[in-house]
UniProtKB/Swiss-Prot annotation:
InterPro entries: GARIL-like_Rab2B-bd. GO terms for biological process: acrosome assembly. Disruption phenotype: Mutant male fertility is significantly impaired compared with that of the controls. Spermatozoa from mutant mice showed abnormal head shapes with an abnormal acrosome morphology. The keyword Metal-binding does not apply. Interacts (via N-terminus) with RAB2B (in GTP-bound form). This is Golgi-associated RAB2 interactor protein 1A. Expressed in testis (at protein level). Residues 226-257 are annotated as: Disordered.
Length: 297
């Protein structure tokens, strides 16, 4: 009886990304391997390219085709957009007895890991399916999509370039993850969660949260001083009333005003991302709102 070899331990239907060769490819396997163990929880979108140069007509940059794998991923899975660019070189070992039909497995060498904010991606030639990649060191690559990829893959890259240039109208909504560039921590108005925020490291709190926390402490101090002053004033008024029994004058004591809206209301939504314009949250910048809440009307 013949034996079937090479079956994986678990067989599952591959997704459309796997069939197109853009998900779970060689680059993804490399960075998720124990050797690197990078971005293990993030999906890698990758494609194979040929490095080319332009001398009248597009041609391979080297005598032997320079094959590269270009991919993007996210340093944190919850990010709405990728923020990491990956580049790897692909080579095939050529032994003295190797032929075109007996080539060994390709060798993948990770060459660059760059933040996408330091990289410029551009669709340079749509008909030839060529990308232009410029790094922060002014190194420019012209990469032609490998012929094994269908046209749909290049459409994915066109869409990716447009999204990276214009952005998306969404942000991550996970309150457990602190991103100073896209989130204001969502905290409730209960005093029990104030200690939780103060226990967070300073690097995870943004400037707005720190400013509001300091303002809240100052507001509590001012309110406590006002209450003490009012208590002593009431005691003094009661003593004067008992001493002077002949006078019938009525006096109205002054009451210290305090803002009814808690300072934590500003942290329920981002100052630049109001989900409902009818909600009674701070609409003015933090600097102008703090003065009203601290000093009262």
């Amino acid at each position: 009886m013949s034996k079937i070899r090479g079956l994986p331990p678990a067989i599952r239907d591959p997704g459309p990304g796997v069939e197109l060769g853009v998900v779970d490819g060689l680059l993804c396997q490399l960075i998720h391997s124990p050797e690197f163990n990078l971005f293990s929880d993030s999906v890698v979108f990758e494609s194979t390219f040929i490095q080319v140069t332009k001398q009248g007509n597009w041609m391979d940059a080297y005598e032997r085709s320079a094959t590269m794998i270009l991919g993007v991923t996210s340093s944190v899975p919850s990010l709405p957009l990728p923020n990491i660019l990956l580049m790897a070189n692909v080579t095939w070992p050529h032994g003295p007895f190797s032929t075109c039909s007996t080539l060994g497995a390709p060798v993948i060498t990770l060459s660059r890991i760059l933040p996408l904010k330091y990289v410029e991606l551009q669709i340079y030639d749509r008909t030839q399916r060529i990308l232009r990649v410029r790094t922060v060191t002014e190194k420019i690559y012209y990469l032609r999509l490998h012929e094994k990829h269908p046209q749909a893959v290049f459409q994915f890259w066109i869409r990716l370039v447009k999204i990276l240039q214009k952005g998306l109208s969404i942000t991550t909504k996970d309150p457990r993850i602190q991103f100073t560039h896209c989130l204001v921590p969502k905290m409730s108005n209960s005093s029990t969660e104030t200690a939780t925020e103060s226990s967070l490291p300073a690097s995870s709190q943004n400037s707005e949260a720190i400013m509001l926390l300091a303002a809240e402490r100052n507001s509590s101090s001012l309110l406590e001083l006002s209450n003490r002053h009012q208590t002593s004033r009431d005691r003094h008024t009661d003593t004067a009333t008992e001493t002077d029994n002949s006078g019938n004058c009525k006096s109205t004591p002054l009451v210290a005003s305090s803002a009814s809206m808690p300072m934590r209301a500003a942290l329920t939504h981002s100052l630049w991302e109001q989900e409902d314009s009818n909600e009674n949250f701070l609409q003015a910048p933090v600097a102008s709102s703090l003065g009203e809440n601290l000093l009262g009307p």
